[in-house]
């Protein structure tokens, strides 16, 4: 079967987009893995099928599949790219400036801006309210604090073979375990892949893979490691179902929420990822706003 596709990315978090408005495409886990393979396929962190929505207020439905074939509840960078795809392919009037996207989590209001060439370049996504209830995240870690009457998991210690780490848990439609590395120079040398103790040299592959599948997270989890700084929150992420990515929109939102809950950040801040920067605001109405770029890389046809 020949498949027409569009390769897109949001801060290096990249996706293979396939138009499935006829709802005629079903891809196996092996086919997804092939499309996402960076040596034998197109190369991506996941595949997004653009499908019609059953909701009259929504333009289209974003069906997101991780590179390992598992379904994802939500993807912040993906939904910005989804917006660009809809604008570029005339599913949305470029002058409209806003629309409502349908996702597995539900409808999300999105606004977007055009660049000097009339192309959509930046989108602001209303990512809905963070979920803090441990049972709904889900996590088996206990809630030890409350905010506005809602209990949340506040820096609970989780053991590992190499030492204990503390996690604050947030769901943005998908589960996140956020770990703050406040004093890198005080951490054990064996936690790093080089002699310089920086976020970039932190052994994310080892710790991310371990905690992603830890028994404390029955549905597995995305794992964020954060270094707070004067210029914002510096973040690396190990995504559930695909490993480290250059950026994670829901992870940036969850990390900002966790930083506010633990007193490390104001309600608006920049989150610096390996692929670039997102602007995140946890609004007073409890909804999280994410703003960042979306880019098309190339289009093509592939035999699967």
Residue ranges and their predicted role:
Residues 167, 175-178:
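Selected transmembrane alpha-helices and immediately adjacent juxtamembrane segments
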Residues 1-121, 178-304:
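A glycine-rich beta-to-alpha transition motif near the start of alpha/beta enzyme domains, typified by
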Residues 135-146, 299-304:
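Extended Gly/Ser/Thr-rich low-complexity repeat segments
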Residues 170-172, 290:
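Active-site donor-nucleotide binding/catalytic segment of nucleotide-sugar enzymes
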Residues 120-130:
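Membrane helix-loop-helix hairpins that form the core translocation module of multi-pass transporters
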Residues 1-24, 139, 143-170:
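N-terminal, positively charged, Ser/Thr/Ala/Gly-biased leader segments
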Residues 131-135, 187:
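Short, charged/polar, Gly/Pro-enriched secondary-structure boundary elements
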